């Protein structure tokens, strides 16, 4: 698998975990989404012509982190 395909797959897995977390309120899914997005960002950062994807994934990661912080504040 090429790095680009791996990063795309990691991003897709992160998006799926994020969607499930919003429906189930399971923190472990948010943590998994964050890890997937972070991995995808690292790879996209190394590839040429992927700045836009990196930016979109970083925004998704920020949303996940905000939800995790909200959960910590509520506890």
Language-model features: where?
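Charged/polar positions within long, soluble alpha-helices
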Residues: 42-45, 66-69
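Conserved alpha-helical positions within TPR/SEL1-like repeat arrays
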Residues: 4-19, 52-67
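Flexible helix-coil transition and linker loops at the boundaries of alpha-helical arrays
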Residues: 1-6, 43-50
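Small-residue (primarily alanine) positions within well-ordered alpha-helices
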Residues: 14-16, 33, 40
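Short coil/turn connectors between adjacent alpha-helices in alpha-solenoid helical repeat scaffolds
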Residues: 1, 18-32, 67-75
